[in-house]
Structures are given as structure tokens and as C-alpha cells.
Design a protein with these regions (language model features):
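A short beta-strand submotif of the Rossmann-like class I SAM-dependent methyltransferase core
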Residues: 102-103, 111
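N-terminal, positively charged/glycine-rich alpha-helical extensions of SAM-dependent methyltransferases
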Residues: 1-13
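A short, conserved alpha-helix within the catalytic core of class I
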Residues: 109-117
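Class I SAM-dependent methyltransferase SAM/SAH-binding core
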Residues: 41, 47-90
Length: 251
């Protein structure tokens, strides 16, 4: 059995505070491709952000995460049942789920075992949506600094699974009847302090701090300050979303 790769429990509160939010239109789209709206499963829910979005369109949402600390930081909602469970062994009833969403987490799973679990819990024609996003976009002079921080400073601390995100999960065998998804992007309006908080949520940043004993975001924030000018100024930040969407066919 593959060991759970826990990259976020140690900073679950910061993760909940500084992660970007999925657009409402994404959840509208997921409801549209779902055959019914009785039950959705938000797998690897983290702080429950996507589960709350799904709860606006589904009668019930089961939101699981292998990290108890992440579940403890999740946003409560009457329609959401939070559970500590690995993606590969959810404990959800067979053929009970209309839609599964995995947001920015598939690369941490035992992927073949997860797909087996997804097929087990999905209803006939139930949908699986896998989303990912890479490095943020602000402006060319800022993006160049962020990319250097991503590649050079924290690069050695990214686990090999990160390559799957960089290729938008395109290299993964997807054993479902695949659809051509609509394009979406996440947007936030942050000042420099909020951006620095987000960079600290990167698993590679946390591993850097653990290995080197100091926070590399302090240095990159100073460099960003030279082009940001006023650190209190709010700028628009975007993350293009990449989706792979498929339908379960039992026959």
C-alpha cells in the first residue's frame, strides 16, 4: 500500500487562509455534466473550499482528506460531511456518487488505485473531474521573479510527482469516457503580503524551511517589492485551470 504523502498538515491554517478560490462557474459546469445532483465527493478536500462550492449545487457532499489537520481547518456547512480517509479507500458506498472532484491533488495519490475506487463509487454515467493549476500569472516582470523562485530556489524541494501538474496531468492514463471541458481560471486580488503568504503554502517552500532553517520567501518578497513598488497595492492574480473530465460507463 502506498504511504499517504502529507505535504500540508503542518501548515493547514495558513493553507486555508492563502489558497486561491475556484470560480463559481466551475461548479455550475460540474453540476451541468453530472447526471443527478444527489451526492458529490470532494476528494482531498483540504480546507473544504471546493466542497462548499459543490454544496451549492448538490443535495449532499462528502469531503474527504487523509490529513486530520486539514479536515479540522475546513469550513463547516450543513450539506457537507467531512471525513478523514485516503483517496484510495474512501469508505463511500458503491454506485452512490454522481460527481467526484479532485482539485490539485491527483499527483499525491496511488493513481491506479484511486481510479479503481472512483469507478466503484460512481453511479452509471457519473462524472469524475480532475483539476490542476500551475504557477500564477500577474505581470511579466513579476512572473519572471516568481518563476525563478519556483524553478531555482524551491525547485530542488518539489517532489517528482509535481511533474504531473506541470504537464496538466496529460500523461496520465485516464480510464473514463473523456469529455472536452470548458476552460476556467481562478482569480484573486492580493497585495504583496498576501502573495508572500501564498508562496509560503507551497509544499516545497515548507521543505526548504525545514532543510535550511530559514524562510526563502523573505528574500523573494524583497525582490518583488522593487517591481511591485507599493506592497499594499492590490493586483489581480490568475491561475489558469486545467481539467480532465470523464464519465463512468459500467457496461
Amino acid at each position: 500500500m502506498t504511504k499517504f504523502k502529507d505535504h500540508f498538515s503542518g501548515h493547514a491554517v495558513e493553507y486555508a487562509k492563502f489558497r486561491p478560490h475556484y470560480p463559481d462557474k466551475l461548479f455550475e459546469y460540474l453540476a451541468l455534466i453530472s447526471p443527478r445532483h444527489e451526492l458529490a465527493w470532494d476528494c482531498a478536500t483540504g480546507n473544504g473550499q471546493a466542497a462548499v462550492g459543490l454544496a451549492r449545487h448538490f443535495d449532499s457532499v462528502i469531503a474527504t482528506d487523509a490529513s486530520a489537520q486539514q479536515i479540522a481547518s475546513a469550513e463547516l456547512n450543513d450539506r457537507i460531511s467531512y471525513r478523514v480517509a485516503p483517496a484510495e479507500a474512501s469508505g463511500i458506498d458503491s454506485a452512490s456518487v454522481d460527481l467526484i472532484l479532485v482539485g490539485q491533488a491527483l499527483h499525491w495519490f496511488d493513481i491506479d488505485r484511486f481510479f479503481t475506487e472512483a469507478k466503484r463509487v460512481l453511479k452509471e454515467n457519473g462524472a469524475l473531474a480532475i483539476s490542476s493549476y500551475n504557477v500564477l500569472e500577474i505581470a511579466p516582470e513579476i512572473d519572471a521573479i516568481i518563476w525563478e523562485f519556483y524553478r531555482e530556489t524551491t525547485g530542488p524541494f518539489w517532489p517528482p510527482e509535481r511533474e504531473l501538474v506541470e504537464t496538466d496531468y496529460k500523461s496520465i492514463r485516464f480510464p473514463f469516457a473523456e469529455l472536452s471541458p470548458t476552460r476556467f481560471e481562478m482569480r484573486e486580488r492580493w497585495n504583496l503580503h498576501q502573495l508572500a503568504g501564498y508562496l509560503r503554502t507551497w509544499s516545497a517552500t515548507q521543505k526548504f524551511i525545514g532543510a535550511r532553517g530559514f524562510d526563502p520567501v523573505d528574500s523573494v518578497a524583497e525582490e518583488l517589492w522593487t517591481v511591485w513598488k507599493n506592497p499594499e497595492e492590490v493586483r489581480e492574480i490568475k491561475w489558469p485551470l486545467h481539467l480532465r473530465v470523464g464519465v463512468s460507463k459500467r457496461r
